[in-house]
């Protein structure tokens, strides 16, 4: 069970997150939302074509369930866009107990057939409720994270950490390469093994990346070395080449 609480990257009261998530469940989009990252309010909305024009409409419907608190979408930034998925970073402004707060929400619109996942349980402490949600399949999450790292989309330490954690949760990796291939194909992108290898080597040898990771893990008290993450990238590279990985 996941508990919704404040993240080190979230600079607003945790109760506002609970208000938003509870509103989503009460709205007509409740059955379509799939949470990718509860701590940082990253979510998929499946079977619904989102764009910069109708995002306001979606959140207006969601936020109407809390009339005593005003949530206003003030900024919509497109991060990633193709026929497979559309990813936006949304900034929501609200006033709570006399203070103004900005809540970043990452919203990804995907087709009906993605993602297909398993059920999990979310506990909303404020409302004493348990809700069933769906999670993206681990192979698809790993593929999507790997793709963003290879393409330099939002490349940062959190993305590398996410890759490492997802890989650690995978018991069977036989479908990883297929998921990555499907992602590239759906984006009409060429999966060039040589380019993958070069990109991994670039990440491995980049002194700034390594130094930033060391500071990041020290600050967050994370016992994962940079070379551990590189091993995950190497494993994926071998899988894409069609090799066999001994674990």
Where are these regions (language model features)?
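Structured mid-to-C-terminal alpha-helical surface segments
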Residues: 2-33, 41, 48, 52-247
């Amino acid at each position: 069970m996941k508990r919704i609480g404040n993240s080190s990257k979230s600079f607003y009261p945790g109760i506002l997150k609970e208000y938003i998530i509870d509103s989503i469940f009460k709205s007509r989009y409740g059955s379509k939302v799939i949470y990718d990252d509860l701590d940082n309010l990253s979510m998929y909305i499946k079977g619904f074509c989102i764009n910069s024009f109708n995002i306001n409409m979606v959140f207006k419907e969601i936020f109407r369930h809390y009339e005593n608190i005003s949530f206003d979408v003030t900024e919509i930034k497109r991060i990633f866009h193709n026929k497979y998925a559309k990813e936006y970073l949304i900034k929501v402004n609200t006033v709570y107990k006399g203070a103004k707060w900005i809540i970043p929400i990452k919203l990804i619109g995907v087709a009906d057939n993605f993602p297909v996942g398993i059920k999990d349980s979310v506990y909303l402490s404020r409302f004493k409720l348990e809700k069933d949600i769906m999670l993206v399949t681990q192979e698809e999450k790993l593929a999507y994270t790997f793709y963003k790292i290879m393409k330099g989309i939002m490349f940062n330490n959190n993305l590398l950490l996410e890759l490492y954690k997802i890989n650690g949760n995978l018991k069977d990796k036989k479908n990883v390469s297929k998921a990555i291939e499907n992602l590239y194909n759906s984006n009409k992108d060429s999966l060039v093994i040589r380019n993958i290898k070069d990109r991994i080597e670039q990440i491995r040898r980049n002194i700034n990346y390594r130094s930033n990771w060391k500071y990041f893990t020290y600050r967050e008290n994370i016992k994962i070395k940079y070379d551990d993450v590189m091993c995950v990238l190497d494993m994926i590279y071998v899988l894409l080449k069609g090799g066999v990985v001994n674990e």
